[in-house]
Every structure is written in structure tokens, then in C-alpha cells.
Amino acid sequence: MPNQHMLLLSNLLPVGLNISTWWNFGSMLLTCLALQITTGFFLAIHYTANINLAFSSIIHITRDVPHGWIMQNLHATGASMFFICIYIHIARGLYYGSYLNKGVWLSGTILLITLMATAFFGYVLPWGQMSFWAATVITNLLTAVPYLGTPLTTWLWGGFSINDPTLTRFFALHLILPFAIISLSSIHIILLHNEGSSNPLGXNSDIDKIPFHPYHSHKDALMLTILITLLFIILSFTPNIFNDPENFSKANPLVTPQHIKPEWYFLFAYGILRSIPNKLGGTLALILSVTILLTVPFTHTSYVRSMTFRPLAQLMFWTLIATFMTITWAATKPVEPPFTIIGQTTSILYFSFFIINPLLGWLENKIMITH
């Protein structure tokens, strides 16, 4: 009888035979989310959301709390792993045309925005130098909004500068947003299972499906093992590899760091913001760097879903990946030549992908019809 139930359960989720390892990142993201919520809960128990005590409470967690250093480092490194997985997940969606499942893609983009907001609020909490100044710079962008900018910024800060009320509300938001992420993830997964996964060929999977368990579940288990092993290797040997040296000093509003920059996973957006000399223009470009993903399902022109059989589109896709990495690198450098021109060039290339790709689809259609 139990075997019958197991058979029924495994056959309830038939999955395309040929989906590759790139399809495993969804389950890895779910694992990252569970890890972040668990470690975050234990950190929240010992954390104090007060500008005089926040920095000391982090030191207290790492030094005095039993296994606190593991929790703190897992939470910080886990965030980087989360973003590595989500960027690969999005790249796979762009390459294999998964965005044509509109509900899944749009809910996923909203998930990305929520995740970025959560990570930003979390970066402010240790109240180190870079935490404070990154929060000052990013929240100050709200002042670029015509008419409403200044009152909006004052409302967000809870005063006329970043102070105790700001830290308290950022902690509250950092605590509540992961639950919004859980809800959005549930919607994302429900919408996915409504239509089913795409596959590397972009063809219909209905003709050849296999049970999710044991085939794909074992593939998931392998990738999760690699993820957790990598996480613990970083944790054991280079736990501060993703941290900024400035953040080991307590926040000082009177001393500005030589080069203010956010965490590495925001550097591509920060690089785009920095490459436009106008404040409002830069803010709009920053917002557009993520929200432009919402347009992708509506600008798909090719008859072929996946890029597997589209060499011209592949060229543009890999240019986008190289561009993304170059912007990230350029944003770590000071605002001076040649980094300014590199930032501006790569920003133009980044947005050009979303304009050129539909044109390439149209061109490929023409070539296919004539041949």
C-alpha cells in the first residue's frame, strides 16, 4: 500500500525528459531561502536594533553566542549564494525562453525585486561604515523624485537624517519581507506547475515525460550537496570573502569612506546608476536595470522559443553576460577614467540586449522563411 502511494505521488509530477542541470537552480533557491530564514531567526534573537548597540551585538553574536559565528557567516555568505543562484536562474530563463510562461516570469521578477529590497535592508543592520553610507546614498536617491522626493525620504528615514528610527524600521522590514518572499515563491511554483517547465530544445515536453522522483529528485540532491559543500568550504577557509573591509569599523557619520559601494550583487545596478551624471536619470536607469526584465515576454519575436537554435541571439546573450560581469567589476573602482567610460559603454550594451534581441528574432524569422 505505501508503495502505491509513492508511485501515485511520483506520477503526479511528470517532468520533461531532457531538462538539464540549469533547471536545478529553483530548488537550490528554495534551499537558500530556508537557510536564510533559519539562520536569520537565530541572529534576530541576539541582535539589537539600536544605533549604539547594533555593531556591538554583531560582535557579541560572533564571539560569545555558542555557534554564533557559524550563524552570522552562514547568513552573510548564504545571501551571496542566493544571488549567484538567482542570477543563473534568470540567465537560464532568458536563454531557453522560459519567459514565455508569462505568469511565472512576472512573478519571478517581482520576487527578484523583493529579494533585492530584503538584502539591502539586511546590509544596513550591522551598522558598519559601509552599511551606513550605502544606506545614506541609496535612500537619498528618493530625493530625485519631483515634488514628493524630500517628504518621502524624511518619511523613510523617520527623521531628517539616517538615525535610530531608520535602523529600527529597516530591521522590521528585513524581518517581514522573507515571509512575503515565501508567499510569492508559492505563487511562482503554482503558476509553473500550471503549465509545466520548458526544456533546452524549447519544444513541447508532453510527448516524452518521466516521473520527477527518482530521476530529477536525485539530480536536485546532487546540486544541493554541491551548494552546501561550497558554502561550508567558504565558511571554513575564507568566511569574509564577500565582506567589505570598511564594514568592520563602526558607522561614523563624520567620516566618509573613500569609495562607497554596495554588496557585490548590487554592483551591476550601482554601476548603471553611476554611469549617468544626472541624479533623476541615474535613479530611473537603476530601477530600469531590473524592471526591464518585465518587458522580455512581450518583446519576443522569434518563431523559436529557445536560443539553442538561434546563433545570433546566442551571441547577444553571451555579450549580455560579459557586460553584466564588466559592469560589476567597473562599479568596484573609483569614479575616474577609464572606469567611467567602461561603465557608460557597458550600461549601453546592457540595455541594448533588450532592444536588439527582438530585432534579431525578426531577422532570424526572415532567414528561416527564405531558406
Curated annotation (Swiss-Prot):
The keyword Iron belongs to this UniProt entry's keyword annotation: yes
Predominant location category: mitochondrion
Cofactor section: heme b
Amino acids binding heme b b562: H75, H174
Subunit (UniProt): The cytochrome bc1 complex contains 3 respiratory subunits (MT-CYB, CYC1 and UQCRFS1), 2 core proteins (UQCRC1 and UQCRC2) and probably 6 low-molecular weight proteins.
Entry keyword set: Electron transport, Heme, Iron, Membrane, Metal-binding, Mitochondrion, Mitochondrion inner membrane, Respiratory chain, Transmembrane, Transmembrane helix, Transport, Ubiquinone
UniProt miscellaneous comment: Heme 1 (or BL or b562) is low-potential and absorbs at about 562 nm, and heme 2 (or BH or b566) is high-potential and absorbs at about 566 nm.
Subcellular location: Mitochondrion inner membrane
Transmembrane segments annotated in the record for this chain: 25-45, 69-90, 105-125, 170-190, 218-238, 280-300, 312-332, 339-358
Name listed for the protein in its UniProt record: Cytochrome b
InterPro entries: Cyt_b/b6_C, Cyt_b/b6_C_sf, Cyt_b/b6_N, Cytb/b6-like_sf, Cytochrome_b, Cytochrome_b_C_euk/bac, Cytochrome_b_N_euk/bac, Di-haem_cyt_TM
One Gene Ontology cellular component annotation held by this UniProt entry: respiratory chain complex III
Stored Gene3D superfamilies: Cytochrome Bc1 Complex, Chain C
Pfam family, one: Cytochrome_B
Function: Component of the ubiquinol-cytochrome c reductase complex (complex III or cytochrome b-c1 complex) that is part of the mitochondrial respiratory chain. The b-c1 complex mediates electron transfer from ubiquinol to cytochrome c. Contributes to the generation of a proton gradient across the mitochondrial membrane that is then used for ATP synthesis.
Cofactor note: Binds 2 heme b groups non-covalently.
Similarity comment: family membership: Belongs to the cytochrome b family.
A GO term for molecular function: metal ion binding
Topological type in the membrane: Multi-pass membrane protein
Residues bound to heme b b566: H89, H188
BP GO terms, sorted: mitochondrial electron transport, ubiquinol to cytochrome c
Residues that, per the record, bind a ubiquinone: H193
